[in-house]
Amino acid sequence: MSDFAFFALETLIKCIIIIAIFASLAGLATYAERKVLAYFQRRIGPDMVGPFGLIQLVADMIKLFTKEDIIPSNSQKFIFAIAPLISAICAFVSLAAIPMLPEFTLFGRVIQPIVADINVALLFVIGTSGLCFYAVFLGGLASNNKWSILGAARGLVSIISYESVGALALIAIIMLVGSFSLVDINNYQSDGFFSWLIFKQPLAFVLFIIALFIETNRTPLCLTENDAEIVAGYGTEYSGLRWGIFFIGEYTSMIAGAILVTLLFLGGFNSFWIIPGWIMMIVKSSFIFFWYFWARAAFPQLRPDQVMKMCYLILIPLAVLNLLITALTVLL
């Protein structure tokens, strides 16, 4: 087999594996969230369908597939129909440039667990994952529902504001490492525990985590939906499979965000003592992913004015200060 044919086959297989694994993980994440929230609230959670309630995932899938797909008569039907697909596609495309595990050898060839190792991977991931919000905005706008439009508008303002916070935090990382490549950022942290960038950039870590909660529409910083204020926000008019596709995209973005935090700040897939790198990657990403559930259970939903004041009066000044300190450190 020629090198080009092997490369094409390898890329195709990687894409299929990533879509299959992360679509399955998105479903498992809904089960995990229900179980974790139940534990926090001293409830049992799903436990009736299958062992430990695991088959509840299949029951939920059947329910979504068989529900009536309703499109409001006064909506922008085409945009309303494709908005969930935009969310899922952008979430999966962002995974293409994220290195998941250490490279390994198969059939005498070195395999990198990444679809495309590009030298501007960080820009690619942030750009494509940021496009997911267009699905939320377009879906809410096309629904012709006041709650959906309010949710889309609130989300638009918050995303634009907090992307500045996340970008300033990432610029500090890029200044230290000197590269946009996620592989280079991972390798920069290969000298041991204290080479992890969380110790060199603790403020950037906190700022990026907060921005990530906004990007993935997670409580307590989610403005796009709120049961007490705007019902389900942008998703008020969605039902059945389209609603499910929206949430596959959302949970895939959450998983991608947890992996990205691990690569940027927590040593990536480098081995730790006698623990292999792939195990470290799974453990650290799972720990970050757990934070989504913990924050939802522990903190109340913030008001829109509180979220925006925190951004412009606290987080952006801190991000600029962190950037200046990092620049001085690099120069000196």
From Swiss-Prot:
It comes from Campylobacter jejuni subsp. jejuni serotype O:23/36 (strain 81-176). Its EC number is 7.1.1.-. GO terms for biological process: aerobic respiration. The chain crosses the membrane at residues 4-24, 44-64, 78-98, 120-140, 165-185, 194-214, 255-275, 279-299, 312-332. One of its GO terms (molecular function) is oxidoreductase activity, acting on NAD(P)H, quinone or similar compound as acceptor. GO terms for cellular component: plasma membrane. InterPro entries: NADH_UbQ_OxRdtase_su1/FPO (IPR001694), NADH_UbQ_OxRdtase_su1_CS (IPR018086). Keywords: Cell inner membrane, Cell membrane, Membrane, NAD, Quinone, Translocase, Transmembrane, Transmembrane helix, Ubiquinone. This is NADH-quinone oxidoreductase subunit H. The keyword NAD applies. Belongs to the complex I subunit 1 family.
